[in-house]
Amino acid sequence: MALFPRGFYGSYGSDPSFTNLFRLLDDFDTYTREVQGSAPETGSRRHTQPTRTFSPKFDVRETEQTYELHGELPGIDRDNVQIEFTDPQTIVIRGRVERNYTAGTPPAQVAGVLTEKGEPHSPAAHHATVEDDVDEDNRSVATTATGANNQNNQQVAQRASAPTTEEKPKAPAEKYWVSERSIGEFSRTFNFPGRVDQNAVSASLNNGILTITVPKAKKHETIRIAIN
């Protein structure tokens, strides 16, 4: 992408070679993003989810001694952002935003619900009951199933002696009804019109704003060598 917007061409881009170069880079960057977004999935990639891409917004400011880039990267960890120079006057900023979720359409009966967690309650556990038998004298006698109790005791003993295995915790059942934040991979390229000092470049990420300061290289001064 060109370093300066199109409105900059008329006021400061007096050199036609720089103007054509900026426009060429800008058009190529736009074409590349469109091709990546509309490429069909064929073959083995049919069942894989395509990588989502987005383009963060940047402001570029020029001073007498530096170029300043300010980009919006909300919710991105600094470890997921890479800044590098591909040539002496071109800087590339790329990164990735990840979020695991399951998207869906909210049903009408749960309108307004943002997340759905938990599982349906299981039916009430069946409890053993005591049966009443009536003897010949019409007296109620409580009977217990001795054989069943012995069988239960054996099962408990077997469970106690068997080695216990740790169960993996289940992932929370969460579902996003609305997903509007940008996620995926991003890459921005800026080409500077003049020489820059790559060794003095500094960058910081605070409150979702990436700030990159690129000092301009000192102008080459002519040095005269005296002949003895």
Curated annotation (Swiss-Prot):
Low complexity compositional bias, start-end: 144-158
Compartments it resides in: Cytoplasm
Domain called sHSP: residue spans: 49-228
Region (Disordered): 34-53, 117-136, 144-174
Biological process (GO), any one: cellular response to heat
Listed InterPro entries: A-crystallin/Hsp20_dom (IPR002068), HSP20-like_chaperone (IPR008978), Small_HSP (IPR031107)
Chief place where the protein resides: cytoplasm
UniProt keyword Iron present: no
Gene3D superfamilies tied to this protein: 2.60.40.790
Keyword Cytoplasm: yes
One cellular-component annotation, GO: cytoplasm
Pfam family, one: HSP20
UniProt keyword list: Cytoplasm, Stress response
Record family assignment: Belongs to the small heat shock protein (HSP20) family.
Extra facts: The N-terminal putative helical domain may be the site through which HSP30 binding to mitochondrial membrane is regulated.
Protein name stated in the entry: 30 kDa heat shock protein
Organism field: Neurospora crassa (strain ATCC 24698 / 74-OR23-1A / CBS 708.71 / DSM 1257 / FGSC 987)
Taxonomic lineage from the root: Eukaryota, Fungi, Dikarya, Ascomycota, Pezizomycotina
